Amino acid sequence: MAKNIQAIRGMNDYLPGETAIWQRIEGTLKNVLGSYGYSEIRLPIVEQTPLFKRAIGEVTDVVEKEMYTFEDRNGDSLTLRPEGTAGCVRAGIEHGLLYNQEQRLWYIGPMFRHERPQKGRYRQFHQLGCEVFGLQGPDIDAELIMLTARWWRALGISEHVTLELNSIGSLEARANYRDALVAFLEQHKEKLDEDCKRRMYTNPLRVLDSKNPEVQALLNDAPALGDYLDEESREHFAGLCKLLESAGIAYTVNQRLVRGLDYYNRTVFEWVTNSLGSQGTVCAGGRYDGLVEQLGGRATPAVGFAMGLERLVLLVQAVNPEFKADPIVDIYLVASGADTQSAAMALAERLRDELQGVKLMTNHGGGNFKKQFARADKWGARVAVVLGESEVTNGTAVVKDLRSGEQTAVAQDSVAAHLRTLLG
């Protein structure tokens, strides 16, 4: 017997029982995006490798350790996208969407990173990202955060996520801070782990993001990034905080929040939770005003975020069990007896025409009434429409409310109207 081929480690199948809740959550997210006037953009899963090296930074965990990179038959180096911002910027430049224009975009789809799989962290994972181009004030930063807060309210998880904010300033401000941080780390080199020693010179701000408790304790005495901010970044951050306070959105300033990708400047933020163990970040983003120019476009202000959908689904299921998937089936059409199947299928098509958006499943594969009603129950149907030989002859159907058990014989021309009343 041939050996079964299984899914790659860390790349999961999502079965019908799971995708139903995903679809409801995604529908909620998309409705909110539409209410803010954001437009969807669809991007390739594979991009040229230099795109990510230039955008994310060569001395980052993503580029050094986590990217799925391969050479195609033409000898070009290609990479499965580890995040969505770089591809979105590339598309904006390539198609002339950015210069002297305002764009508010969102995308959704799989990303790929070669990490150690664990709950909430996978090698293929799904993100929903938003990117705004052409606006540089703190008001658009605030709008993105307000948009995410509206998501949490719609999903019933507001009490289980908290907002952390920081400003990492301009490129010049970070360069000054970098020198001060390196000088401090050199004085305490013996307390650093090997990863931090390596990063101390290649990308010292990443040391601030270390998960090592000893390094975190050491950093309590390190220079504070906030003390090195340029005046424009201070004003921008103060404006953002004021707007969030006016909107009633609570936040904590976390001066060690720097984000894992090199392209950020000024505003950075994360929504975090204590309800998912070690995988606490649900949504994160910030401003990246230099990235468009860095990737070959004209200087364009930009801000955005990405949200991990696997973690969001886990969080909703953990803290809001009342948020359930929409039923797969509203109406189940039962047919039994000689020559009833073609009549049942014809009636089903008429009902689909007249009841837009209603989910109707026709029984196939035969079976007596008892078996067919069991199937209707399995699919979660609220109503059954029943056709037997006498109903076909008389041009009627029996409509049965599967919750109350009440049933009514109705002329086939009136079935749609009767179902509208039953389904509300």
UniProtKB/Swiss-Prot annotation:
Organism: Shigella boydii serotype 18 (strain CDC 3083-94 / BS512)
Protein family (similarity comment): Belongs to the class-II aminoacyl-tRNA synthetase family.
Annotated GO biological process: histidyl-tRNA aminoacylation
Localisation: Cytoplasm
Chief location bin: cytoplasm
CDD domains, per the entry: HisRS-like_core (cd00773), HisRS_anticodon (cd00859)
Substrates-to-products reaction catalysed: tRNA(His) + L-histidine + ATP = L-histidyl-tRNA(His) + AMP + diphosphate + H(+)
Quaternary structure and interacting proteins, as annotated: Homodimer.
EC identifiers of the protein: 6.1.1.21
GO MF terms, alphabetically ordered: ATP binding; histidine-tRNA ligase activity
Domain of life: Bacteria
InterPro entries noted in UniProt: aa-tRNA-synth_II, aa-tRNA-synth_II/BPL/LPL, Anticodon-bd, Anticodon-bd_dom_sf, His-tRNA-ligase, HisRS-like_core, HisRS/HisZ, HisRS_anticodon
Protein's recorded name: Histidine--tRNA ligase
GO cellular component: cytoplasm
